[in-house]
Amino acid sequence: MKIDGYTRMAAVIAKPIRHSISPFIHNQAYQLTATNVVYLAWEVEEEQVEQSLQQLRVLDMLGANISMPYKKKVLPFLDQVDGSAQLIGSVNTIVQKDGRLTGYNTDGLGFLKSLPKTFSIMNKKLVLLGAGGAATAIVVEAIRQGVGEIHLFVRPESLDKYQAIFAPLSETLDVSIVLHDLSSRDQLNTTIEGTDLLINATGLGMDGSSLPIPKDFIFPKGCLVADLAYFPAKTPFLQLAEEQGAKTLNGLGMLFHQAAVAFELMTDKTFPEEEVWQALKLEYPDYVLEK
């Protein structure tokens, strides 16, 4: 990668963030598309977020990606927020142009793009275990793509909190979003029947041992099973699903595709998907579910 007096910057902003693989993805894409930009990881404190965003303008940066815990905190400091990001209530991509900062959320589209090309969410039944993090973004994008039915399972103590989030969303988008108690086995067994896409968005399993469901849980036949985690590459949730013959995917594809959408928003160039994906698999083999 050539760096000279004309090189611009982009960054991912969060804390912690030095472990991120986003710099690898974006810098590979810049190199393959002859884009004179370097992408860095900025680990900043909460009280430095506004100042960091101001640097996007001052340094005429291409933009930035925002990771947890700052996806909501950046909203007041933006000049404009894309409609989908407004519905989701968080931003993971900021484009800087002529001193103006525009916020987007590419998480939901990134996840849907990571699904097998033979799978369409149109008129399908979607069930999510957990409603935090990227779950709202996935729900909004699934609705945009014509999902038929949405169910979310959350901890009983969080039901009221998420009801307050998803009820207005359901009304605005005119789609039924039903919340359930994750601790109720009867609700889970009844609701899971006929599910086309089941997503673990709880974070349980990143320790390599915990499960968001009972060990004797029976996955619906023909159901595509996803986990938003990508380390370990195969969580206990995905392992259990595979043992029952289900098709599975982890969260690496979502991370990759949300980065691809962000790259295109920032550069107005086509993301070199196949080349970067192959490079990513070689650089981070431990994150890849299918070798």
Regions found by a protein language model. Name each.
Residues 2-119:
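Phosphate/diphosphate ligand-binding glycine-rich loop within oxidoreductases
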Residues 3-4, 121-122, 144-146, 214-223:
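Short, conserved loop/helix-junction motifs that constitute active-site signature segments
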Residues 9, 125, 148-151:
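Residues at the starts of beta-strands that form the adenosine-phosphate
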Residues 14, 103-105, 115, 119, ...:
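Glycine-rich adenosine-cofactor-binding loop
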Residues 224, 228-291:
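Adenosine-phosphate binding glycine-rich loop
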Residues 144-149, 244-247:
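Conserved S-adenosyl-L-methionine
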Residues 147-173:
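NAD(P)-binding Rossmann-fold cofactor-contacting core
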Residues 176-248:
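Rossmann-like adenosine-cofactor binding region
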